[in-house]
C-alpha cells in the first residue's frame, strides 16, 4: 500500500511469496487504490503484481529485502520441534517488526518486553512470539546487508503519551471541543 511513499534510501522488507499476486487480488487494497496502482504500474511498464510495485520502489532507490515469512516459520518450527508454529501466519506481524529491527540494528529488548506484556496472561503464546521475534531478528542481522543507519536510544520523557494515529486524532477532537465524530 505504501510503495509510492518509499523515498530514495528507504527500505522495503516484503514477503517473497506474495510477489506474483495481482494488485486486483490484494484484499487490503480498496478499489480506488487498486485502479490507481494498476494505472501507475501500466504507465511504468511494470507487471500488475506485487513484484511490479517492489521493482518501482527499487528503481526509486529503495533498498529491497525479500524473505519468505512462511519459510521463517517453518525453520523456527523445526528448530523448536513444534510443528504447529509453521502454520501460525498471525505471527507474520512479529516477524515483520523483528526483521525491521534487525535490519536497522535496533536492540530487540523492547520488542521482547512488549510481546511479553501483550501476552502476559498467555505465557506459552508469549514464549512462541518471543522465539519468533528473536529468530527473525537474528535472520535479518545475518542475511541482510548493513544499511549503515545508526539509531540512538532516547529516553521517554515523563508525561509522554504514545498513541496510534486514529487515537491521536480522536483525542485532539475531544480537546478541541468536538462532540461528534462520524
Task: Identify the role of each PLM range.
Residues 1-180:
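Active-site cofactor/cluster-binding pocket
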Amino acid at each position: 500500500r505504501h510503495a509510492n511513499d518509499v523515498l530514495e534510501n528507504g527500505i522495503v522488507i516484503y514477503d517473497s511469496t506474495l510477489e506474483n499476486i495481482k494488485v486486483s487480488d490484494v484484499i487490503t487494497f480498496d478499489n480506488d487504490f487498486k485502479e490507481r496502482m494498476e494505472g501507475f504500474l501500466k504507465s511504468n511498464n511494470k507487471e500488475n503484481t506485487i513484484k511490479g510495485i517492489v521493482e518501482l520502489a527499487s528503481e526509486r532507490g529503495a533498498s529491497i529485502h525479500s524473505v519468505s515469512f512462511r519459510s521463517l516459520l517453518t525453520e523456527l518450527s523445526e528448530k523448536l520441534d513444534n510443528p504447529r508454529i509453521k502454520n501460525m501466519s498471525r505471527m507474520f506481524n512479529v516477524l515483520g517488526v523483528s526483521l525491521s529491527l534487525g535490519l536497522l540494528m535496533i536492540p530487540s529488548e523492547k520488542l521482547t518486553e512488549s510481546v511479553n506484556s501483550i501476552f502476559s496472561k498467555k505465557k506459552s503464546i508469549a514464549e512462541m512470539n518471543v522465539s519468533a521475534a528473536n529468530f527473525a531478528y537474528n535472520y535479518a542481522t545475518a542475511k541482510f546487508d548493513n544499511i549503515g543507519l545508526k539509531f540512538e536510544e532516547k529516553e521517554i520523557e515523563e508525561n509522554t503519551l504514545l498513541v496510534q494515529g486514529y487515537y491521536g486524532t480522536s483525542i485532539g477532537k475531544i480537546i478541541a471541543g468536538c462532540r461528534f465524530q462520524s
